[in-house]
Amino acid sequence: MTASRSPATDLPKSWDPPAAEYAIYRQWVDAGYFTANPASDKPGYSIVLPPPNVTGSLHMGHALEHTMMDALTRRKRMQGYEVLWQPGMDHAGIATQSVVEKQLAVDGKTKEDFGRELFIEKVWDWKRESGGAIGGQMRRLGDGVDWSRDRFTMDEGLSRAVRTIFKRLYDAGLIYRAERLVNWSPVLQTALSDIEVNYEEVEGELVSFRYGSLDDSGPHIVVATTRVETMLGDTAIAVHPDDERYRHLVGSSLPHPFVDRQLLIVADEHVDPEFGTGAVKVTPAHDPNDFEIGLRHQLPMISIMDTRGRIADTGTQFDGMDRFAARVAVREALAAQGRIVEEKRPYLHSVGHSERSGEPIEPRLSLQWWVRVESLAKAAGDAVRNGDTVIHPTSMEPRWFAWVDDMHDWCVSRQLWWGHRIPIWYGPNGEQRCVGPDETPPEGWEQDPDVLDTWFSSALWPFSTLGWPEKTPELEKFYPTSVLVTGYDILFFWVARMMMFGTFVGDDDAITLDGRRGPQVPFTDVFLHGLIRDESGRKMSKSKGNVIDPLDWVDMFGADALRFTLARGASPGGDLAIGEDHVRASRNFCTKLFNATRYALLNGAQLAELPPLDELTDADRWILGRLEEVRAEVDSAFDNYEFSRACESLYHFAWDEFCDWYVELAKTQLAEGITHTTAVLATTLDTLLRLLHPVIPFITEALWQALTGNESLVIADWPRSSGIDLDQVATQRITDMQKLVTEVRRFRSDQGLADRQKVPARLAGVTESDLDTQVSAVTSLAWLTDAGPDFRPSASVEVRLRGGTVVVELDTSGSIDVAAERRRLEKDLAAAHKELASTTAKLANEDFLAKAPPHVVDKIRDRQRLAQEESERINARLAVLQ
């Protein structure tokens, strides 16, 4: 933009990420680059940010997800799309209410001391004071979201959407109230969703006891359970219909030892006749499998616990006991009657625990509100079957269909105060009415006290954030959203629910634009990423102590380094293992790019029209041809959400080809007065920085502005085909030159010659190998000088190339300090031995081999092999120096 500017002075001598990144991000936001305009005539591209919990902070999984979404939106913006990346946060019902209740408890208060309305005001106060941490973290990562549209799932607009769809589902008969089994938290006093339950292996006891006769003289059946207290609610005993041992008992009954109740013996396919005694106790009100058996056989469903997990209403001596105390008391009472057959302690089994409060959840029969999912799940499944929504990778499709084709009705009510209040009102005589957003409840009626599951409102996120149920320009421009980026671990919990609700309202006038387009799905693509694991391949968890705060790495290495590490490891559906060494390597990559650009600018790199191809050097034609190949590779990778492939291609081109070779060759060309070299340097850097920008936006912005003087990479054009094909003849010459230089450098290293120490040399076979044009490059990059009249070769290197063999004769006499070289080699040998011992010990550790993922073991084996080769090479060199 400014002809008189001095690009080299626009850059500091080194890159300081913390200071530079903050200033650059502020410039982007102030310039409005991320603000979406629904009135634009550009094609629309939109992504909704999976809303993080308002109580939380961004973890490494968020950082991965945000990096990929930011990369996609930045690229599309550069490709000429009107881009909306919609930010927002989830109200996180249970988590948020728990945080505020804990704050009240510090002062000895409970939410009941304030009442519902005052307590909710306190939650809003907390949200306003403490709910902004995530926004700051997103800015540190470089998220290019439209902050002007930041949403919250409890905003009035989103609340209206919740009430609207609830009313429509209710009127369609798809929401109903019923007593069914739920995950119940006795501590939180509410039902929980499946995702709020963590399963942990615990040591318990397996108690086998007899129903019926105490000896073998009369009818009896032995059953086993880890929750013996639930036998107070048993209403049947189930056996397999083909089990000959019990066939004569099916249809009869056995008495309950503590209550006046007969237990019906039923035949059910669910029972595994090979497991245990082949008979199971059936407690329909306290076990999911038993509940299904109870429905099939129309069994009584007797709840034996109150909401706090205490035995209640059984009419036994156990009433009032905590469930765990009752477990001991019931076992002792059975033993006193002589009914205990066997007790296994410890017995390791999986038990569901409340994610938030930590206690074992209690499957419990409870009166709740439910969504009838059969037709909704079918529509969600059909959207993928019909290709309206494409799941990436396609290998995840079977899991998707297995879930949506066998989905159970969804419990959507929660016994909380914080959340979307269920819009059902009750009259004085038991009347019930669903009140829509534009309706007024009758005078004197009372609203249902429960709130909706957090997942209910987040299921509306793709269209509620765009203004639904109103008709808005945003819905017209940006809906359906282009892609959903999320973890495969919540494919069913969140993605399926968004698909169900999205297809349910897909033919709504606000979405079809009054019929101007057909029914829509919430997103065109679903990209599922894997989980972040530590460098040993273990899942990150607080209990393992291996959780890493992404901002710690941002502070240490910069946001670009973290982003490149995550994107480079991200393949569709695959988990990625990362450690500090990976981020340090990415930081080094950024430094390499910075130094190469700074060198180019200091040497006059400037964008200009390139001369005809036949006037370019072999090196020029090679780097420009490779650049075009990499551009096409990166485009293909991004189009298929293959972030790892894109980053690997860019990394190896930038480091191995451009920085390590072309920049060095450019120095030779500039020394020879080849003036167009500066234009080739600038052209290559210009395209490379544009291609890298979606993943490492900060450093590329600074470098590109210094290179071009233009406003911002954010709004620059994405590279298009240059039309420059890879020149095969030039490429072969460069390949041969690289091999020749590499072999000479390896020989020099083995001889103990210092880098850049000039050595007289004579080359033979150059013309026959078609390398006449590369002699100056070989001489410069291999640190050789011309052989003088007194040249006496002391060594030679033969390098077989495609067109022939080049012999390099060298005079190394007097160039080596033998004693110093021995000291250096001995030091290197000690390091190689240490690495060899370390890797060998790891590979001999059976526990490590059993637990570590295959790719981690392979890396250790590679390190062991390299250490062995290095040790052998050094020993050979030491032998020569004897």
From Swiss-Prot:
Keywords: Aminoacyl-tRNA synthetase, ATP-binding, Coiled coil, Cytoplasm, Ligase, Nucleotide-binding, Protein biosynthesis. GO terms for biological process: valyl-tRNA aminoacylation. It is an enzyme of class 6 (ligase). The keyword Aminoacyl-tRNA synthetase applies. Its EC number is 6.1.1.9. ValRS has two distinct active sites: one for aminoacylation and one for editing. The misactivated threonine is translocated from the active site to the editing site. Belongs to the class-I aminoacyl-tRNA synthetase family. ValS type 1 subfamily. Catalyzes the attachment of valine to tRNA(Val). As ValRS can inadvertently accommodate and process structurally similar amino acids such as threonine, to avoid such errors, it has a 'posttransfer' editing activity that hydrolyzes mischarged Thr-tRNA(Val) in a tRNA-dependent manner. HAMAP family: Val_tRNA_synth_type1. This is Valine--tRNA ligase. The gene is valS.
